């Protein structure tokens, strides 16, 4: 990313520089070595194409360029992560509360002889809450990153280099520019190489380009684009078969792969939606607290309190507004969901990403391995002049065809014999489809198909011994082998051949029909052409098969076949049939795509594969739904040129990467706006990033799936990047926020559902927690305004927030989803907030007020039973709290000492506390749902039922446990005092059920606009 040190002076400059770097990286790969001759390349890098570099020269270059490795992405130091948990977001609010408490205690200690320790305790408790929850969240995230660490394979990689004419193994990190390197099948390419010689070399570029077919490598320049040409192999791709020798033209971060990794680590990562929500919520709560505090500060000054008293009141009100237990609740909710998702194969790297998935409105998915099974499978055969369907299901429950036909027997023989793939050893008791194969994708597909339908291929090969073979090469486009036949009476050799269908057909004079050879006439050629086009149009890779029995008189037993200078016939053969292969969709994907559609999520396919294949899979999994046409489909139907079709008539579209290169941002925006179903084919990594940015410009929250290194910039840029756990590369796993352990697209949909559920349940938890703020604040306000004895003390407020309310609030995280969760549109992050005005108005203005009434009712009942009628309480505060007054008269003329008065007051605190617990029962039950009736939802949440019992038991314990009067100033209550709040609790339940009934009967009406949070 350039040297950052000298940019410290002006942050603006470095921002501009980063943007420029990113724009450079977004441009396609610039490279010229593939157009130079071998001699020019050797001259440019001062090397010899036979001897290689000298040892001293190699050391010199290594010192100059540094090791051949990718710079690891900058990691956040652990202490910074810990501090973020301690001082980030919600914790700040509690820290401010704690500091204010210490301040208030300081003021009291300085001005009073015998200050009450309440504020000191409160401050200590608040600080403890933050530290404990901070440690908890830090531990959770550290656990996820431990799993991440274990993904990194620590095996140092070796490379075979030629220096001073000798072959030597060196650590891949020591390879330098100009080195002569040899690679063979099974090796990882150690750097970007310009090939100077190759023998049957094929490389798997899928982690770079997304192209799943192995690509041939040769010394010739075949394309202007370095990613497409055959004479360059790239760092960290795999060599599948053959051998090659090349000159290193780039190492480390300067390789194509290195540029992509740099591109990923240089991207700005925005805040997660839930972080923005929590910030918004803190601003709201702080606003309410400060507004109330300041109003009553002014009011108490008007009422004649001293400055110091007014400041203490101000602090008291602000602290009473802080929901102490909420930080822990949010953390626990996110953790629970992350655990639940891990059970469903989604590993979440950072807790906040859990919710991001729920607000996703667009998923850009990779095709290979995510939507498909990532194993080529035979899908169709054409023999006896008809197309037969093969079984592509994962459990072989699909269709079958007539296996007794003689033509099929011949076809299966060719496919099994003219095939170099073999099963790896020791897998006899593993199902055929799950076995590992040594060989390329198409050959393994044929091997598995024949093994399943015709029995052991190994036996077939033993019975028909191979005597000669011409491997596949790109000039003749066929593969041929010659075998002895298994019939002991037949001494002829059997020649079998497979390859590109049109090339195979050109070499044939006859065709096998119902086991008999017929002449290959024009009619049959047309039938072949139609079948070939039909299978090709399904996006399948088609191969042709033919055979020929070599006449015994020309080729007697023991004939020496020469495969270099061919001494046998390769024309006038007998055409047997076609077989076509596809990487079939995963079983659960179509259903998952359907769920996304009903949840209002747009699924876009982005792949490096061919447009026809991409479109076929998109139709197969429902990304392009039935009846929706692309521009090409409409043109074909109406028989007019594509240019005459109005693109707006087509709901679906397939866009080729080469066209995307020339698009402006406006054109990309237009495509994203006008088409509901989009497939991008033949895209490069840089284009993937452009697509993600385009979606984000539309205001979408974008999830991106990918497994290759090529996907990492897009994974990083997206709101949530989803990497593949099995097939994914290390770079993609580092860039992602979430990892699918089973590589299955369907797991993403589970993730979306969990994400929406956590958002709903957090809303419910917050609504539940905030409601009890009103019965906690109002006693304080009346205490100031009406000058009555304090109805509820600070310690009791803490017992509610950190005691009785905790388990019920967390239990809402276990609440099952409401029926409409996957039928809603994705939430709009600008308007649909976690905590909105309606939630505040419900919690504070409606339910909270009923709760406060219940508490005051208990308070007045107890004081009246003790002789202080409500009318006499107003204005009694100064005398009540004065230690020197020991003869205060009640409404009946009895005299009360200071100690006696305080016992009654603390009994009132306890009763007020118990009343809040009783009304919170109803609040918890109504918070289970936002729209459904509680009777619809049922009481299946066992944790919630436990929560109800737990808070009641805790309240009873605090009231009746001996010694509580000293420790927490809680006193035992008469049983009848528990029932004071029951009617209010019932009222809350009825009130809310009626509100939800109106919501359901009259969607979009006034009640919904005002009260649906």
Swiss-Prot record:
It is an enzyme of class 7 (translocase). SMART domains: Cation_ATPase_N. Keywords: ATP-binding, Cell membrane, Ion transport, Magnesium, Membrane, Metal-binding, Nucleotide-binding, Phosphoprotein, Potassium, Potassium transport, Sodium, Sodium transport, Sodium/potassium transport, Translocase, Transmembrane, Transmembrane helix, Transport. It is found in: Cell membrane. GO terms for biological process: adult locomotory behavior; blood circulation; brain-derived neurotrophic factor receptor signaling pathway; calcium-mediated signaling; carboxylic acid transport; cardiac muscle contraction; cellular response to amyloid-beta; cellular response to retinoic acid. GO terms for cellular component: axon; calyx of Held; cell surface; cytoplasm; dendritic spine head; dendritic spine neck; endoplasmic reticulum; Golgi apparatus. Mg(2+) binds at residues 707, 711. Pfam families: Cation_ATPase, Cation_ATPase_C, Cation_ATPase_N, E1-E2_ATPase. The modification Phosphotyrosine is found at residue 548. Signal peptide: none annotated. The chain crosses the membrane at residues 78-98, 122-142, 279-298, 311-328, 763-782, 793-813, 834-856, 909-928, 942-960, 976-996. The keyword 4Fe-4S does not apply. NCBIfam families: ATPase-IIC_X-K, ATPase_P-type. This is the catalytic component of the active enzyme, which catalyzes the hydrolysis of ATP coupled with the exchange of sodium and potassium ions across the plasma membrane. This action creates the electrochemical gradient of sodium and potassium ions, providing the energy for active transport of various nutrients. This is Sodium/potassium-transporting ATPase subunit alpha-3. It comes from Rattus norvegicus (Rat).
